[in-house]
């Protein structure tokens, strides 16, 4: 039977069958319960929960990619198999994805639930960054994943993540939105409600760009260069955005402007590569893949390339790639991996689980 590939990222669950070009189902990763609290056992999963959000409290059982509510996570997997894919998990191997720094106890719990609650014949857990690399046709490189709240650099060599080289940055798209709100507030605009926050996020995505040279860009504006853009608010009012367009994304390269002591994304990538074996570094510098919504900012690839070239030996060729953003990239990588003829040797089988217990996941899913 075809393996099932199930990915959870950016608040959505994507599931389908190995070998397919796209997931069969995509739905919100939420469990909703009535706000009145009269029946705490009543719950609505996925689209059902989303459709009734006016009367429900919606919760995602994961935070920063890490499960923190296993009962709800099990409900979501049950809903995925039986309601969305309409299959019996006892008949399909299952490939699940995980974020970097997924705690050991969580990996074991995922394994235990798959075998004990769903009675799957085999399962595997793969890091999302590795699968993202697969989807771009590579098995070696560094994945810089710019998330909403946190970002990660994950070096991968010949299809395996190098754990000692993984770095976490407490820097993400949300910081850029917050900084833009701060700058716009200084100019006399106010953004306090969640609807207003959404407007600022939209301004960021549509009008902001990364300066190739920040100081030079600043100088241009003081010398009368016009980089103004107009944004039409939902009520028809117009606001003009000027130097904020490039000041906002500068946070990625100079987190100190918002008071963060974190490294810039270019330094984190370099530091991540320096933690890898010397003989792998040339391949790493030549395959730097950026992913996440923030990578859509115009100019980010060129600036990243420039900053890295200034940090690394001139003998190293730096190549930064920003593949066309596909919400399904990780899932597609999983579909490719689970359909490889050699992959059947990698699955954790039911027999292995029964013999070694859930800790087998650390040995087989590295």
Swiss-Prot record:
Domain of life: Eukaryota
One function term, GO molecular function aspect: ATP binding
Keywords: ATP-binding, Cytoplasm, Cytoskeleton, Nucleotide-binding
PROSITE patterns cross-referenced by the UniProt entry: ACTINS_2, ACTINS_ACT_LIKE
Cellular component terms per the entry's GO annotation: cytoplasm; cytoskeleton
InterPro entries associated with the record: Actin, Actin/actin-like_CS, Actin_CS, ATPase_NBD
Keyword Cytoplasm included in the entry's annotation: yes
Chief location of this protein within or outside the cell: cytoplasm
Note: There are 8 actin genes in A.thaliana.
Subunit structure: Polymerization of globular actin (G-actin) leads to a structural filament (F-actin) in the form of a two-stranded helix. The binding of profilin to monomeric G-actin cause the sequestration of actin into profilactin complexes, and prevents the polymerization.
Entry function: Actins are highly conserved proteins that are involved in various types of cell motility and are ubiquitously expressed in all eukaryotic cells. Essential component of cell cytoskeleton; plays an important role in cytoplasmic streaming, cell shape determination, cell division, organelle movement and extension growth.
Family: Belongs to the actin family.
PANTHER family in the cross-refs: ACTIN
Name recorded for this polypeptide: Putative actin-9
Organism whose genome encodes this protein: Arabidopsis thaliana (Mouse-ear cress)
